[in-house]
Amino acid sequence: MTKKSQTVSIRLLRDGKQPADSVRAGVELAAWDKLEGAQIALDTIGGGPPKWSKFLDLSDAEKAKLTNLTAYGLVFIPASGRWFAVSFGLGHVKLDPDAFEQDFGLRVVLNTVDPDKLRSADIRTPDENTTSRRTQTARRSDQTAFSIDIERDIVRGLAGEPKVTAFASRVAGSDGLTLTKEMDVAALPQVCADAFAAFGKDDYKANFAWIDQIKHVRDKATIELLDAALVAALGGCLTGAIPDTLHLAYPVIYDPEKARHIRYKGFNCSNVHTDLEIGGYVADMREKAVPAYEPGHLSGHKVYECNAEGKDDGQSWRIKECLVFETDLNGEKYVLSADRWYRIDTNLANEVTTFFAGVTAHAMPDALADENEEKYNGRVATGGHNMLCLDRKLVKPTGASYSIEACDFLENSGAMIHVKDQTSSSRLSHLFNQGTVSARVMKMDGPFRDLLRTRIADQETALGLTGYQALVAGSGTPYSEAAHLVVYAVICSGVGAGTNRLPFFSLVTFRQAANELRALGYKCAFAWIAKPASTTTKAKRKPKTTPVAVAA
């Protein structure tokens, strides 16, 4: 019989798992004599009318015409000393994800795909505002076509054509492996064995070694151990010092210029804070004499946006969604960010930390308690600090449809200083990007510099300052990158202000920005702007009303 091209979806059970351990309740397995030792489950999903029938308010007679049934099949095959699940239809929804090897399909694809014949990639960029995207190409391409940031992005899925066509004509993989090849049912055990052999190789390191630098942790047992380490660290804060590996950050892109306050709820505390910071959270727990930090607090304690009186006025998040934490487990580095755990390659972690430690430090005036970026810039602008404030003084680059800020401050040394609050990695990523964009435009766009010089002259007049316009070369004058040190300045408050360390993902984006600046010919520096701990007040409580007796 002629073999036809068939597409199958294969998953690998964890070592020691049996078919009965890997299916959801209600799935009945039976021996299948078509393949030696195999087991099979066949059934349908559904049985009732579709949900949209309610919207149309259909009669029973009309609904009877719309019985919605979907068939599925699961075949469990023993091969190479392990069990494999081959799913058909919606069979995969009847499988327990925790019973299967994570990234099995991705690893097989990485080891078998032709690196110049990729077709699509599913990519996740971890941050406080994690983004996911699928990129597809119209023709065979190498990895450069997918704009993968090898120091930040996680590849969750990959598809392409294998180097050896005998293995398959097309492969795609994430946790499961989907492959297309000419075969009949009798070939399934060998197909599974070949996939398992590819899974065990490390050929991928020749072209995709960076894939192991950052991994999203999804194994429940590992997450439990990491959560336990987080709970232990928070428990230690109740009686001891707060480690510099523990922070709080907004889990969304947050505008620090909003006049928001926050409260930590879940342990009967009424304090109102002007900043989200780990020191305030710990102080509140100490004030309420929380005896020990328990696992349930990670979801039971919450952060609420509120007004100055403590009334809820905005969003809220579980405290774990806001925690940023770095720890080691079994010799490997892990990072918690936006409620997700990531395993970080130790070499990468050490490299970005060492890089940051070697960056030139720059001195900036301290911030006052409760100052955000806007208030800080406004006060320093008139404080006689040998800096001209250009905050919000936008200039449009030649041919651009948008305007940019050259910097927040132009120092009398020529340094261009960019300022942001340490509220989240996403805000800091914006800061680092702002610096590189500005530096590139300054270098390449003479007319932009002319417009900027006009802006500077206006500010000099407004603030009664002189000498700053001459620091920026006009379009008719040679431009010197050496004349402009690019400084990233981050406002940090609370415990360790001025000696803080950036969260891991911020360190990664900082190194990328600094290297780009160096490639453009600039030097780069970093400044911590120390700010006292945020002000704490008590939420105003509604006065109790005395019931008024009604005369009989």
What do the predicted segments below correspond to?
Residues 344-404, 527-530, 537:
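Catalytic-core elements of nucleic-acid end-processing and repair enzymes
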Residues 422-463:
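Catalytic cores of nucleic-acid endonucleases
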Residues 55-69, 193-196, 382-407, 476-478:
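Active-site metal-binding core of divalent-cation-utilizing nuclease and nuclease-like domains
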Residues 408-421:
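Conserved catalytic cores of phosphodiester-cleaving nucleases, focusing on short active-site segments
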Residues 61-71, 431-441, 463-474, 507-513:
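Short, charged, amphipathic alpha-helix that recurs within catalytic cores of restriction-modification
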Residues 3-5, 24, 80, 90, ...:
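Extended catalytic cores and adjacent scaffolds of nucleotide/polyanion-binding enzymes
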Residues 1-157:
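Long, charged/polar, low-complexity intrinsically disordered N-terminal extensions
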Residues 150-368:
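Long, charge-dense tracts
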